[in-house]
């Protein structure tokens, strides 16, 4: 499989459309909320168009996840690496969200900015711990619009299961990218895959995951494995743990 970081975005976005309820636990953890897990969140439109001042062309902007739960709006960006543009992109996405949901009152507009978080699938010593946006106004007032970033490498497999952080699970295996790509020792990776298969199956048996959710998560794990291994000798051995190679997930 060609190395294309859009593969990560595609899986994250597919999860939000096919299994949006799985994001409730993620939002509860990221934003210190306690929404019931049986409520139905609303996926808000994320595509807007902005004129690029450098090219004078109209470009589409689409955030990874914009979701409304009980009247609260959340923006989540899934980033494979730091490219120096995340803060300005968040500012654009957040303003577009606020504009699309603006409240108009006789010459006055109220812009409700969403709470946001950036999730780094892969990270290094250079990955910022915070995304910081400062809004400065002509009257001298300044508003900070910041968040603490989530680094996936800091979340253990046990916490992903106990906190029901299902959207993170397909990307867990990226922490072994160096070993997989360079044909190093993958015993720990194999052990972790077995752990996820066992624990996800238990959650299915306890009716916490539907058959489609279980199989889709496992197949998304395999897509990430295939992305990393790119057909090397480890690929077949690793994907077999989750049930072999599947090109389409059950929800598709």
Question: Which role does the model predict for each range below?
Answer:
Residues 3, 7, 44, 88, ...:
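Alpha-helical structural elements
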Residues 34-37, 44-50, 98, 172, ...:
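Charge-rich, low-complexity amphipathic helices
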Residues 161-188:
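Coupling/switch segment of ABC-type P-loop NTPase heads
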Residues 68-80, 103, 183-252:
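Short, charged alpha-helical interaction segments and adjacent helix-coil junctions
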Residues 1-167, 252:
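Accessory alpha/beta interaction modules
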């Amino acid at each position: 499989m060609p190395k294309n970081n859009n593969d990560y975005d595609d899986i994250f976005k597919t999860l939000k459309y096919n299994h949006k309820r799985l994001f409730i636990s993620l939002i509860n953890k990221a934003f210190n909320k306690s929404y019931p897990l049986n409520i139905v969140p609303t996926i808000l439109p994320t595509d807007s168009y902005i004129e690029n001042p450098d090219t004078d062309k109209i470009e589409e902007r689409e955030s990874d996840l914009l979701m409304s739960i009980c009247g609260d709006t959340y923006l989540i960006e899934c980033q494979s690496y730091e490219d120096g543009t995340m803060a300005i992109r968040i500012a654009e996405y957040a303003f577009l969200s606020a504009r699309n949901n603006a409240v108009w009152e006789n010459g006055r507009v109220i812009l409700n900015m969403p709470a946001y978080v950036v999730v780094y699938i892969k990270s290094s010593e250079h990955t910022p711990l915070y995304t910081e946006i400062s809004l400065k106004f002509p009257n001298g007032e300044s508003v900070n619009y910041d968040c603490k970033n989530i680094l996936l490498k800091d979340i253990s497999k046990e916490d992903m299961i106990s906190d029901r952080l299902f959207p993170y699970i397909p990307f867990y295996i990226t922490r072994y990218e160096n070993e997989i790509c360079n044909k190093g020792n993958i015993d720990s990776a194999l052990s972790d895959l077995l752990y996820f298969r066992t624990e996800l199956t238990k959650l299915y048996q306890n009716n916490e995951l539907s058959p489609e959710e279980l199989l889709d998560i496992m197949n998304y794990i395999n897509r990430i494995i295939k992305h990393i291994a790119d057909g090397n000798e480890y690929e077949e051995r690793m994907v077999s743990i989750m049930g072999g190679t599947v090109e389409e997930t059950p929800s598709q």
